UniProtKB/Swiss-Prot annotation:
Coiled coil feature spans: none
Keyword Transferase: yes
Designated gene of the protein: gmk
Native organism: Legionella pneumophila (strain Lens)
Chain's role: Essential for recycling GMP and indirectly, cGMP.
InterPro entries: GK/Ca_channel_bsu, Guanylate_kin-like_dom, Guanylate_kinase, Guanylate_kinase_CS, P-loop_NTPase
Name of the protein in its database record: Guanylate kinase
Annotated Gene Ontology cellular component terms: cytosol
Chief site of localization: cytoplasm
Entry annotated with the keyword Disulfide bond: no
NCBIfam families found in the cross-reference section: guanyl_kin
Record key words, sorted: ATP-binding, Cytoplasm, Kinase, Nucleotide-binding, Transferase
Length: 209
């Protein structure tokens, strides 16, 4: 259980190649007091990735063991690899008043919303399927058959957009980044958030009348 002054939880989801990871990294650079939750995964490390920064890379046996121990608030199998979000990682940050952003897929987002009803969810979509395919090809991480599989799955994933609170079209990266930042800032300024955070100031101002 988190306190009234706890941090906010944000979910950012998108089809593979939608740009959510780049947008989340930009958000962390632009906004203070917010951190990305590092997920556990059984997939191999990609070039440029770092252990404990991009993911915690573990084998399937370790992953299943953590599932059985209840270590994950959500977990899902995506493209034959497991991904999971640690309960402890989220709650520790929220309890210290730090905002947490989750870079996950729609399946994980669904599980997170059940556990954290106040979480703010954002779905990122590409300007077109052609643009999405081009991004997947430009990453040079997957073979043609894997890209085709990702494109087929993307069309199914896009159908889940109504389940989210906000929708951002990632056509212009800088514009999309500003829109994501605006969502975070606006949520921080909601009355129920500010009433707790600014309780002393409000009490002083009202008692001075």
């Amino acid at each position: 259980m988190v306190s009234d002054n706890s941090g906010n939880l944000y979910i950012v989801a998108a089809p593979s190649g939608g740009g959510k990871t780049s947008l989340v990294k930009k958000l962390i650079e632009m906004v203070g007091e917010i951190e990305v939750s590092v997920s556990h995964t059984t997939r191999p490390m990609r070039p440029g990735e770092k252990e404990g920064v991009d993911y915690f890379f573990i084998d399937e046996e370790q992953f299943i063991s953590m599932v059985n121990e209840g270590a994950f608030i959500e977990h899902a199998k995506v493209f034959n690899h497991w991904y999971g979000t640690s309960v402890a990682q989220i709650n520790k940050r929220l309890q210290f008043g730090i905002d947490v952003v989750l870079d996950i897929d729609w399946q994980g987002a669904e599980q997170i919303r059940h556990a954290y009803p106040d979480a703010v969810s954002v779905f990122i979509i590409p300007p077109s399927l052609d643009a999405l395919k081009e991004r997947l090809m430009n990453r040079r991480q997957d073979k043609d058959n894997v890209i085709s599989e990702r494109m087929t799955k993307a069309q199914d994933e896009l159908g889940h957009y109504p389940e989210f609170d906000y929708l951002i079209v990632n056509d212009d990266f800088e514009k999309a980044a500003m829109e994501l930042q605006s969502i975070v800032i606006a949520n921080r300024l909601r009355i129920e958030k500010q009433a707790n955070k600014q309780a002393k100031l409000l009490s002083f101002l009202l008692s001075s009348q």
